[in-house]
UniProtKB/Swiss-Prot annotation:
Belongs to the TrpF family. It holds the Pfam family PRAI. GO terms for biological process: L-tryptophan biosynthetic process. It comes from the Bacteria. InterPro entries: Aldolase_TIM (IPR013785), PRAI_dom (IPR001240), RibuloseP-bd_barrel (IPR011060), TrpF_fam (IPR044643). It catalyses: N-(5-phospho-beta-D-ribosyl)anthranilate = 1-(2-carboxyphenylamino)-1-deoxy-D-ribulose 5-phosphate. It is an enzyme of class 5 (isomerase). This is N-(5'-phosphoribosyl)anthranilate isomerase. NCBIfam families: PRK01222.1-7 (NF002300). Pathway: Amino-acid biosynthesis; L-tryptophan biosynthesis; L-tryptophan from chorismate: step 3/5. GO terms for molecular function: phosphoribosylanthranilate isomerase activity. Its EC number is 5.3.1.24. The gene is trpF. It comes from Streptococcus pneumoniae serotype 19F (strain G54).
Length: 199
């Protein structure tokens, strides 16, 4: 079954909602953005997450020192890196790694040392999907996440189109820039059961 990552969480209530609804991954954004949290804030929230739900830290062009500090302070299970990636960034990290790839029309998939790839829209966090026809995932060495403009209305189609390891959502479960607990529940319900979640 396709796994679900709920990203950009910053409150106790949102974390608890995502966990209880069945999220497999919880994402904390450490890069500058409206969803950014500090290492200290994430460490507090991480204590609410059971061991079978994986904690992901999201970074843009980080140094290896930054990654190691966050892994240690927050207890991250994975790091997700956007932007520039040094050749040795993922070598011998104490946790798994995800390299984000912006799908911009050239169809290029990098030769990455990361454990997973994540395919995102050209502007991450914009709520806009990329053109799914521009991405060919045939023969990929790594399992991959699909992100970029996913929501409860299109996520089932995305899963049918790509058969990804996991799907990733942030703005698609927000209302007025804040995490919407009902949207989180409905999104996960659609992925896990292919239905709207309304009873």
């Amino acid at each position: 079954m396709t796994k679900v990552k709920i990203c950009g969480l910053s409150t106790k209530e949102a974390v608890e909602t995502a966990v209880s609804a069945g999220a497999d991954y919880i994402g904390f954004v450490f890069a500058p953005s409206k969803r950014q949290v500090t290492l200290e804030e994430a460490a507090v929230l991480a204590k609410l997450i059971p061991a079978d739900v994986k904690k992901v830290g999201v970074f843009v062009s980080p140094s290896r020192v930054e990654l190691l500090e966050a892994i240690d302070k927050v207890g991250l299970d994975l790091v997700q890196v956007h932007g520039q990636v040094a050749d040795d960034l993922f070598e011998n990290l104490p946790c798994a790694s995800i390299q984000a790839v912006q799908v911009d029309g050239n169809g290029h998939v990098p030769n990455s040392q990361a454990d997973y790839l994540l395919f995102d829209a050209p502007v991450a966090g914009s709520g806009q999907p990329f053109d799914w026809g521009q991405l060919d995932t045939t023969g990929l060495a790594q399992p991959f996440f699909i992100a970029g403009g996913l929501n409860e209305d299109n996520v089932v189609k995305a899963i049918q189109h790509f058969t990804p390891y996991a799907v990733d959502v942030s703005s698609g479960v927000e209302t007025d820039g804040q995490k919407d607990h009902e949207k989180i529940r409905r999104f996960i319900e659609r992925v896990k059961h292919g239905i709207s979640g309304t009873k």
